[in-house]
Amino acid sequence: MTIIKKPDLNNALLRAKLAKGMGHSYYGEPAWPNDLLYTFPIVILGTITCCVGLAVLEPSSLGEPANPFATPLEILPEWYLYPTFNMLRIIPNKLFGVISISLVPVGLGIVPFVENINKFQNPFRRPIATSVFIFGTVTTVWLGIGATMSIDKALTLGIFF
């Protein structure tokens, strides 16, 4: 047995609070003008203040000057360019290498149209997109690791032969 306490609507204090709109849930507040005029500028100014403050307190140094007569043995690009660098390095024909790199975004653009009839969002129920994602991730990691090795081990990673 549950006891339900009903509000006393004859209470003047409760009626005053209800008249002000207290006790009612509006499920959020409007974005205009609350968020766009008040919250966003404060967050943006706070972010700019943090960046400027950190730059003033701890300025970054430029490092040692470049010496053109002391180059490293192997010049590597940044880590996020390793797969592309390795693909261009292991493909002997440069035109075919550039074409193969340009086919990656084309292939990724085709995937939504191939699986357009599938209405599910669950990755286990979208086998084509899931297999393309897994194959692309494994290939990218494989090529990225191979970019840090010598050219004879770049494709096989020294595992197979």
Swiss-Prot record:
CDD domains: cytochrome_b_C (cd00290)
Disulfide partners: none
Membrane topology according to the record: Multi-pass membrane protein
Gene Ontology molecular function terms on file: electron transporter, transferring electrons within cytochrome b6/f complex of photosystem II activity; electron transporter, transferring electrons within the cyclic electron transport pathway of photosynthesis activity; oxidoreductase activity
Keyword Nucleotide-binding on entry: no
Pfam family, one: Cytochrom_B_C
Gene Ontology cellular-component annotations: chloroplast thylakoid membrane
Main location: plastid
Family: Belongs to the cytochrome b family. PetD subfamily.
Function noted in UniProt: Component of the cytochrome b6-f complex, which mediates electron transfer between photosystem II (PSII) and photosystem I (PSI), cyclic electron flow around PSI, and state transitions.
Quaternary structure and partners: The 4 large subunits of the cytochrome b6-f complex are cytochrome b6, subunit IV (17 kDa polypeptide, petD), cytochrome f and the Rieske protein, while the 4 small subunits are petG, petL, petM and petN. The complex functions as a dimer.
Official protein name in the record: Cytochrome b6-f complex subunit 4
Annotated source species: Cyanidium caldarium
